[in-house]
Regions:
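Outer-membrane beta-barrel proteins
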Residues: 1-156
Length: 156
């Protein structure tokens, strides 16, 4: 749900495989975002849930962005609640021949660093995305992971 005022709320879900009890992730989120010329900002809250598992957590985030020509640059700062890890993320994106291209670099405090490289295209009202992700753990609390993900999304 997105309102003209800039307020938004939603639910996001996916399958996961963190341990034997975690097989689904359901996130509830809301916030306020605005664009003013080439600048944008987004202040929001996310509640991450793993029904039947453990590891639920919440965070507040502040995202800042700027468009420079055909390139979008962004930085997001996430503040974990109740001992959840903080996160800083830098991103860049552009469009080339109708295909969106992006890269994201991030660092979760005391957990690990990650990179995501993606390509996306809208076809018939569906957003198709192909991404490669790499997570390098800082300690034994997490494990290194690489993945290739294909996503089909539809916004209402």
């Amino acid at each position: 749900l997105v309102l003209d005022s800039g307020l938004y709320a939603g639910v996001w879900g996916s399958n996961v495989d963190f341990d034997a009890n975690d097989n689904i992730e359901l996130d509830y989120y809301g916030g306020y975002s605005r664009e003013t010329g080439a600048l944008s900002y987004d202040l929001g809250y996310i509640d991450y849930n793993y029904p039947g598992g453990s590891g639920d957590f919440e965070e507040w985030y502040l995202g800042l962005g700027i468009t420079a020509g055909t390139v979008d640059l962004g930085a997001t700062f996430s503040f974990g609640l109740d001992n959840a890890n903080d996160n800083i993320e830098l991103s860049a994106g552009t469009e080339l021949s109708g295909i969106g291209l992006g890269i994201t670099l991030g660092d979760y405090d005391n957990s690990g660093k990650y990179t995501v490289v993606s390509a996306s295209k809208e076809i018939g009202g569906l957003e198709l995305s192909l991404a490669w992700s790499d997570f390098d753990a800082d300690s034994g609390n997490s494990s290194d992971e690489d993945a290739v993900t294909f996503t089909v999304a539809k916004s209402f």
